[in-house]
Amino acid sequence: THRNGHVEAPAHTHSRITIRNKKELEQVHICLGVPSHSLSHEDRYACHILNTILGGGMSSRLFQNIRERQGLVYAIFSGLNSYRDTGCLSIYAGTSLETAEKVVDLVIEEFRNLKKQPVDPEELRRAKDHLKGSLMLSLESTSSRMSNLARQELYFGKYFSLDEMTSKIEEVTADEVQRLAHTFFDTRQIALTVLGNLDGFKITRERLDCN
């Protein structure tokens, strides 16, 4: 809803599987994405916590389980992009052709795990501390503070202090994170793009089943 009361429907796209053979690429580049909430949605802080737990740093599930423990990727992370009317939660992984299918399977497994059971208190605590630390660092410079003020005025018409934002982060519960996982991680909503020297590589929608 805009400030003048006009309501626009959220943008809608089709969730496709795109496979592109690029022989010049040394790695296989994998990107999965699901729709998420808008920048002003009431669950925006829980969205950031979910992203942090999934792939937002070296202590995240994707990094620890797929890169550190199994060594299947060169890099892996998730990111949250939020706009006025919609958003996108995306996961990137760089790997080899031999391990590409396994990496996709393990990402889908993490989707399932986040849906199956609430995050434990220790992991939730780490995610909150990480997110608050990142927020504080992002507002250290004058230019970043001015950008934050402008963004808040554009999207909210008001200013949220650092204390207000950190308090909202603290209010996020494990049940809220699990609820968002159920909302976002729907097999029908997952978009997948794979680029690389793929040599006949194929993947089906059934392989993305996270229910």
What residues fall within each predicted segment?
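Charged substrate- and nucleic-acid-binding regions of tRNA-handling and nucleotidyl-transfer enzymes
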Residues: 156, 178-179, 188-195
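Non-catalytic beta-strand/loop surface segments
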Residues: 1-41, 52-105, 123, 144, ...
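C-terminal subdomains that position terminal phosphate/3'-OH groups for nucleotidyl transfer/ligation
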Residues: 111
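Double-stranded RNA-binding/processing signature
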Residues: 44
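Short acidic/His-enriched helical or mixed secondary-structure segments at domain edges of catalytic enzymes
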Residues: 68-69, 73, 114-167
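A short, acidic, flexible beta-alpha connecting loop/helix-capping segment that sits on the rim
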Residues: 195-201
